[in-house]
Regions:
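Bacterial N-terminal signal peptides that target proteins for export
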Residues: 2-21
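N-terminal signal peptide c-region/cleavage motif recognized by signal peptidases
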Residues: 28-29
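Boundary at the C-terminal end of the N-terminal hydrophobic targeting segment
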Residues: 32-36
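Amphipathic beta-strand/beta-sheet edge segments enriched in Tyr/Trp
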Residues: 40-42, 46, 183-227, 287, ...
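N-terminal segment of the mature soluble domain
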Residues: 57-76, 127-180, 263, 268-287, ...
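Signal peptide-directed extracytoplasmic domains
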Residues: 75-136, 147-153
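A short, hydrophobic beta-strand-centered structural micro-motif
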Residues: 86-94, 131-135, 164, 168-205, ...
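C-terminal soluble interaction/assembly domains
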Residues: 236-331
Length: 331
């Protein structure tokens, strides 16, 4: 029998403390990413019967595997399907709502091991926030953009899909014209993402933009969100996340003890970082060995989301026998 708990413990005390400090440190600047709870899911519950609850636990586990890996077919992997058939060893907490929905939290360590057994990658919880620019049919003809103050059925469908895939989304506070929306979608940088959907005779035409790249597709609202999730997962959940590696990273811009403490707290709070070891400290530059689920390129991409660690200028040469840093800390 699974205990009905009230709290989810997904990380060690030190890491939870670090992530809390990271949140406080970054509150002073707007975040371009959302911190997604990877191993949680909300699913319908047919009844309070044990068989229905077990089936709901299994469905929630499949959804958690999709959220954590970024792969829409993760639930079909043999190891995931076997775990979903007997999920009790993975469930850490659950609760039910008045709407007969089951909220389930899974053990993070057990789920991460399960993803590895299934040969699935890991999509870190720091994910770009996607601004949705959705143009729905207007009563007077043509289309109009959905704003944050509105909740048409299409928005609800997108948000349900975003919950399943683990994609943080936001909506424009004010109306946007079609030309501006197209420009934003095709010119989105590394700090944010834009999903543009325009209603047409055969459904919706979708354009997703992030990091200077764009992808296109067609289909309903859920298909548009799926395009965004698949594109982001391809960038942030590479094959290197299937295992652990040690990545040496040289970081400059450390102007004192407080700066160094803030940096180490930041690094330890990142979800793909498993360990932070200082190898060398010289002047304002530190060389760390980071144990990560991924590689240096993924670290670069995650760092770029909030700009706290920026690539060191290529023109910055080594001085006094000290190697040039890879990144510069922005306190």
């Amino acid at each position: 029998m699974i205990a009905h708990c009230t709290n989810v413990v997904t990380e060690g005390t030190a890491r939870k403390f670090a992530r809390g400090l990271l949140f406080l440190l970054l509150m002073v600047s707007p975040l371009a990413w959302g911190d997604v709870a990877l191993y949680q899911a909300v699913v319908p519950l047919k009844s309070t019967a044990e068989a229905d609850r077990a089936a709901a636990f299994g469905e929630a586990l499949r959804i958690a595997a999709v959220r954590a890996s970024g792969r829409r077919d993760a639930g079909d992997a043999a190891a995931i399907a076997a775990a979903a058939a007997d999920p009790t060893g993975y469930v850490q907490q659950y609760s039910t709502t008045a709407e007969r929905m089951l909220k389930v939290g899974f053990d993070a360590r057990a789920m991460e091991q399960l993803l590895q057994q299934a040969g699935l990658p890991l999509w870190p919880s720091e994910r770009p926030t996607t601004t949705v620019l959705l143009f729905v049919p207007a009563i007077a003809g043509g289309t109009r953009a959905v704003t944050a103050a509105e909740r048409p059925p299409e928005r609800l469908e997108i948000e349900r899909a975003a919950q399943v895939r683990g994609v943080p989304v936001t909506w424009p506070a004010e109306t946007v014209d079609a030309g501006t929306a197209r420009a934003r979608a095709t010119s989105a940088g590394v700090t944010g993402a834009v999903l543009l959907g325009t209603a047409g005779a055969g459904g919706y035409d979708w354009t997703f933009g992030h990091a200077g790249q764009s992808a296109r597709g067609q289909g309903g609202p859920a298909a548009g969100l799926g395009l965004a999730a698949d594109t982001l997962a391809a960038r942030y959940a590479p094959g290197s996340t299937r295992g652990l590696s040690t990545v040496p990273v040289r970081i400059g811009g450390l102007e004192g003890v407080r700066s160094y403490a803030a940096l180490t707290t930041y690094l330890d709070g990142l979800s793909l970082v498993r360990s932070v070891s200082l190898r060398e400290l010289a002047g304002s530059t530190a060389l760390f060995d980071l144990g990560v689920r991924g590689d240096l390129e993924l670290l670069r991409r995650i760092f770029a989301l909030d700009g706290r660690l920026t690539p060191a200028p290529r023109t910055e040469a080594a001085t006094n026998g000290q190697e040039a840093p890879d990144f510069v800390w922005q306190p």
